[in-house]
Amino acid sequence: MVLLKFHGGCQQIGMSCVEVETQKGRVLLDCGMSPDTGEIPKVDDKAVDAVIVSHAHLDHCGAIPFYKFKKIYCTHPTADLMFITWRDTLNLTKAYKEEDIQHAMENIECLNYYEERQITENIKFKFYNAGHILGSASIYLEVDGKKILYTGDINEGVSRTLLPADTDIDEIDVLIIESTYGSPLDIKPARKTLERQLIEEISETIENGGKVIIPVFAIGRAQEILLIINNYIRSGKLRDVPIYTDGSLIHATAVYMSYINWLNPKIKNMVENRINPFGEIKKADESLVFNKEPCIIVSTSGMVQGGPVLKYLKLLKDPKNKLILTGYQAEGTLGRELEEGAKEIQPFKNKIPIRGKVVKIEFSAHGDYNSLVRYIKKIPKPEKAIVMHGERYQSLSFAMTIWKTLKIPTFVPVRGTILPI
């Protein structure tokens, strides 16, 4: 019998970790850290044959250096991006040591999409494209004859940087699926609409002589935003002003350029036509950022919780300047305070009065509710489904949707749940 043990990522976003246990072997699907609290799953690394990583975001891979795993499987881009995620975590929190990162990197084995790997005599797996960030994968396992699809984070729609998630997948017994936007209330505007809103907000500020600060996540969101802005500048629909970048997004964007064959083919075509899709990456020079000329500043971190973006927030003293939030802002973060209309913030010693405009235009690398519904209709019908990686309301809502749509048993585990399959 195969057991699924849920160590995290249940009725929450963060700390994703599922253990697949058999009598002859066991593997972990992701081993993430909570972005809010730094909490990690409690697992026995000595008993685990391997960790299979879906992608390089902190909530899916951040806990790996805490442990001494024998083997870590991921795609080639994910290995490079995980190094950036781990080094960022080390710099910000001192959660682990450089030697821990080195140990993890030395035990990574990289695979391409669709390439099969046997881990133990009764466990083999392969990766499908998940469409979430560069190198992101859904994990397809065959364990004691059972076929399990762990989606990781998926986006069934096309983005500027990536092709959509694969849906032409082998037969499935058990589906383990994310539910970030699992509620019928989680229907997002079309990507073109969001892009127009972003450019209109930037244009308004630039034309008034102001500066635009855009906090981003280093991997995925940063590249999408840079691609959009540079595309509109090239087309003449946005004034050509300096774009300054700061933080680990500079290294992450270099990784994106290194793996151009893993991206949307349109990006490869741009490069072959001598166009830099992400624009010239200029490290922010504070003497230029804080002068009187209009500019755009794209910097980590996405939730304004640490990172170099904090030093640019004093620009919001000036009503001409603007902050554009492009993603989810967790409870307790400075980003959430700003989103909720804080009139004053204190990222450092001195308080900063907020006179500039703060707007939110959410660009998500996750599929919205409609996208998730399309996904479950396109893939082979599983015998049962398990819903995780979503807040309680979203997970329970999407479990109900799966039941109504596919008429199959659907589970919403909590941390510590053990399910026999």
UniProtKB/Swiss-Prot annotation:
One of its GO terms (molecular function) is RNA endonuclease activity. Its cofactor is Zn(2+). Keywords: Exonuclease, Hydrolase, Metal-binding, Nuclease, Zinc. The keyword Glycosyltransferase does not apply. Zn(2+) 1 binds at residues 55, 57, 132, 153. Optimal NaCl concentration is 100 mM for nuclease activity on RNA. Zn(2+) 2 binds at residues 59-60, 153, 389. Inhibited by imidazole. SMART domains: Beta-Casp, Lactamase_B. Optimum temperature is 60 degrees Celsius for nuclease activity on RNA. InterPro entries: Beta_Casp (IPR022712), MBL (IPR050698), Metallo-B-lactamas (IPR001279), RibonucZ/Hydroxyglut_hydro (IPR036866), RMMBL (IPR011108). Its EC number is 3.1.-.-. Belongs to the metallo-beta-lactamase superfamily. RNA-metabolizing metallo-beta-lactamase-like family. A 5'-3' exoribonuclease with a strong reference for 5'-monophosphorylated RNA and no endoribonuclease activty. Forms homodimers on heating to 60 degrees Celsius which may be the active form. This is RNase J-like protein.
